[in-house]
Curated annotation (Swiss-Prot):
This is Lysine-specific demethylase hairless. Residues 722-731 have a biased composition (Basic and acidic residues). A zinc finger (C6-type) spans 595-620. GO terms for biological process: negative regulation of DNA-templated transcription. GO terms for cellular component: nuclear body. Residues 227-257, 302-380, 411-443, 507-546, 697-746 are annotated as: Disordered. It is found in: Nucleus. Expressed predominantly in brain, hair follicles and interfollicular epidermis. No expression in dermis. Its cofactor is Fe(2+). Pfam families: JmjC. A motif (LXXLL motif 1) lies at residues 561-565. Residues 307-321 have a biased composition (Pro residues).
Amino acid sequence: MESMPSFLKDTPAWEKTAPVNGIVGQEPGTSPQDGLRHGALCLGEPAPFWRGVLSTPDSWLPPGFLQGPKDTLSLVEGEGPRNGERKGSWLGGKEGLRWKEAMLAHPLAFCGPACPPRYGPLIPEHSGGHPKSDPVAFRPLHCPFLLETKILERAPFWVPTCLPPYLMSSLPPERPYDWPLAPNPWVYSGSQPKVPSAFGLGSKGFYHKDPNILRPAKEPLAESGMLGLAPGGHLQQACESEGPSLHQRDGETGAGRQQNLCPVFLGYPDTVPRAPWPSCPPGLVHSLGNIWAGPGSNSLGYQLGPPATPRCPSPGPPTPPGGCCSSHLPAREGDLGPCRKCQDSPEGGSSGPGESSEERNKADSRACPPSHHTKLKKTWLTRHSEQFECPGGCSGKEESPATGLRALKRAGSPEVQGASRGPAPKRPSHPFPGTGRQGARAWQETPETIIGSKAEAEQQEEQRGPRDGRIRLQESRLVDTSCQHHLAGVTQCQSCVQAAGEVGVLTGHSQKSRRSPLEEKQLEEEDSSATSEEGGGGPGPEASLNKGLAKHLLSGLGDRLCRLLRKEREALAWAQREGQGPAMTEDSPGIPHCCSRCHHGLFNTHWRCSHCSHRLCVACGRIAGAGKNREKTGSQEQHTDDCAQEAGHAACSLILTQFVSSQALAELSTVMHQVWAKFDIRGHCFCQVDARVWAPGDGGQQKEPTEKTPPTPQPSCNGDSNRTKDIKEETPDSTESPAEDGAGRSPLPCPSLCELLASTAVKLCLGHDRIHMAFAPVTPALPSDDRITNILDSIIAQVVERKIQEKALGPGLRAGSGLRKGLSLPLSPVRTRLSPPGALLWLQEPRPKHGFHLFQEHWRQGQPVLVSGIQKTLRLSLWGMEALGTLGGQVQTLTALGPPQPTNLDSTAFWEGFSHPETRPKLDEGSVLLLHRTLGDKDASRVQNLASSLPLPEYCAHQGKLNLASYLPLGLTLHPLEPQLWAAYGVNSHRGHLGTKNLCVEVSDLISILVHAEAQLPPWYRAQKDFLSGLDGEGLWSPGSQTSTVWHVFRAQDAQRIRRFLQMVCPAGAGTLEPGAPGSCYLDAGLRRRLREEWGVSCWTLLQAPGEAVLVPAGAPHQVQGLVSTISVTQHFLSPETSALSAQLYHQGASLPPDHRMLYAQMDRAVFQAVKAAVGALQEAK
């Protein structure tokens, strides 16, 4: 036989040089008989290697195994030590567990039969080489040692999974040198990547692993395989006797685990299904942590699961006597101590009497007989694996409280969340064994050092910082389940009994990680609602605000809140310049947020009287000179308790006050922009997230940007052309008074030519073929290159076109621009004739499951919506003429020119002529009777039935999450938003110039439900058919339904043109189109035709049948005509899409009733509360 195996012949000379003493692996100063430690090895025990082979005092490989030339141990030729014995002298010159650089000089050869009958190394004395210089030669066909070879270069690798015969209960005892394979041998073969070593040479203890030197995740992995799994072999018998792996989690099938890879490696077809293998071999992953490479990589260390050796999770110091399981490493002060039973030797002895405590602490890897260890395996798994999130067994290392803190901190990181709760990484074509453990519950801890000083641990804990308060809130809800579900008759260990009543940090983390997806979702919703409630908002709308609705709220209201915050900073800066100190904070629910002089809403900063409820907004405070007279007079006796509004208030009596502190607003602004970036919500605000502008500086002064130099948005060339367009059409904030529009207007967002070029370059990049840059080149263009010309021509054309439109539309364009900004609608150019409007939305279900986003899109564009199917939930007995005839109401007369006028008729006379036209009272030819009633407390049953029948309850219901009325203060009266009952007589076909509701503009959104309509008489069918044929294809109705009312709805941006048209065609005083005021004119077919042909304004026509609802956005002019006698119920709501437009209309409505004015003055407050609720819901969302 050859003196050297063939796979070692090409070894360099320096690798084959024998040590000085002549015996490979012999340690100086030791006798040949002490070359091997006589000790047993527990399952899961790590054994380090030096120069590719085992070389520590704990080495238990067979005699003659290949050793390195440095710090090696002696090997005995011919006869090895007896099993079960150990030598205390081994520990004399050692310093505890030491890792050396390990590097395979040669790849192992794997060939030959799958399961050889006998195993054993070829002893040098049986070979032809020199026994002292020729190392052990393996039989190439019978290699039992399966090593981890897919490792980092010059990094430690792990012990071969081969055990002595006495550890294999299923195998008969053989010669001392016959070492059968362990039940789960693994092979990793591959080249060594060129990366720095993880451990230094000759270092004491462990070094911190640098995550920067981990192997890249995309590095190709080596082929893996298993040996000795042929039918009838020892390994196959052991696998069959082993049964299902203890590492397998409950509910996990073998399909998701590793298959038999032995035939793949050896060339045998895998025809017989094999039993599932454990995810990691015993003793491989022990003290190096659970991640070798970063999450998501397919490297070896990451795919290895937790080690098989269970650990004792209970706290307490370790027991001093030695001889404990090698799986328990030396514990620092405060670490989790090992189980008592693991420390006692079955022989009743521990370490020798001559060993010191220091030596016992260093000799942490001493092995105890595995019989006792294997007996406790299932017991420990039953007790602790589920409690401490150890699927299939706990790690062999002891874990300190600092490690628990690290685990809690890592659990909140995005990487860990993505790896632990997301789908498992895709397996490669030939995955390594152990990948089956990857999943939703796979441990994703980073490598941590075990041996270290207490000072280092404290320093690391200080660097980590305190934990989040939300984690403590979650931990308080968890229940301790330690040692509650164990086998009958099994006694708990002493340390577990001591910790039975405590709920540790690690236990809470494990409980939280083990929650089902439904429980996690419920817990997240509870935490989100708790966070929102702590923010101070109302409990109703914030309790169940989901992620989709919160994003919609924030996308529609975030820009407006930024404008409000910008005005707030300007107000504070002006107050500081006037010498005012920090504003006082006061917020009482019963105080109306309304200016006592201009009746505009108060967002935050304002002036108030210290003796009464008199308040002034910032604009009125400037006019009144608030805060100035106090310095001049120097006395405050001039204002007394007599400070009623009739007597007026002295300027010195006003105090600068805030409802919300500036610090709270700054935090909300910062968090809102962070949520925008997190969920990719597109905002178009001017503000730059800088909390320093809110913080008061030295001497009470605040750093505030001047009003003349607002921050400008950074240009981009990502194809977003609407961003620049929306910024250019920015108008003063909705809360500004009309008198301040001219003075408070900000300059254009493009003060320089460079910014103008940047803002238009995006459009030009998309429009021209030869332009692919955001800015024009500085160098002159070639004669054949017209890029500069195209850019300049486009800029000039856009400016000129805009100026032409402004001149053509007159002074009302700026108000119309505000309307366009509120609805994000393009301005319709003036043409002789326009094409019909776009298709309208008709919802067949009141609460659509799949059409909600479609409704939001149409609603954002300012289009009306028709909804059918409401009659299914309406109780006809509550809305019929017989039930409503007993109710009272106000009867009004409506004419074609003028608002409704009250009459002397009572409601009884009105209801008698409702169904019988011959009994109706005598009226003028150009008038129609109406009846109006507010549904209040006496109509509780009807209000309840209406609330349950409302379509799109997120918008229309009072407590809808997208209805800003639900965010208003609780003490505010909502009379304008209460349901209103309207009944009207039908209009004859020959009187088409009359309507049941004249052309008007509502300040808020409107929904009108037709609850009842009288049956049509036979002559009316022909008139209805003629009427439908004259719609010119601009209407929407449901075929086959009983058409009862006709709606004409115009665009909101066309209101200014319609107003000018009415001033031309209507008598003086009848052509006003004031927001919130009753209509004074009805446009018949002739006037609508003139408006369409001469002014380019067209309308949508909707035909409404009983049981249908029409939704009209705020600011959209509309009128209604009843073909028959009808009863309808209308209700107003405040949607986020039209909130900015509603605020502008509120300022323009001079004749609004006081209760309406008080309601709309709180719009800014509702926006603030809605944004705060949305930010709170999205801040912790995933």
